[in-house]
Amino acid sequence: MSESNNYSAFFVLLFIFTILFLIVVAFLLLGILNGAFATYAHHPLSPSLLSSLDFVLYLFAFGILAVLFLLIAFAIQRKGS
């Protein structure tokens, strides 16, 4: 029974991680679109929606989330065995 609880916790974490990943990807796509509109149409979607520094910050935040997710998943696996 505890093994199924560990698996359900793992899948909840995986679901949360996937949603966070999709949010980061959406922001990155918005940044690419913002750059494309600013470059080719000279009408940015918003002046400071995302800059190249924001790309680095979002990638850094995603890296931190990935490491935290892996640590939590490893802790759940160790607890189960």
Swiss-Prot record:
Topology term for the membrane: Multi-pass membrane protein
Protein's organism: Acidianus two-tailed virus
Keywords: Host membrane, Membrane, Transmembrane, Transmembrane helix
Protein name: Uncharacterized protein ORF81
Transmembrane intervals: 10-30, 56-76
GO CC term (a single one): membrane
Localization terms from the record: Host membrane
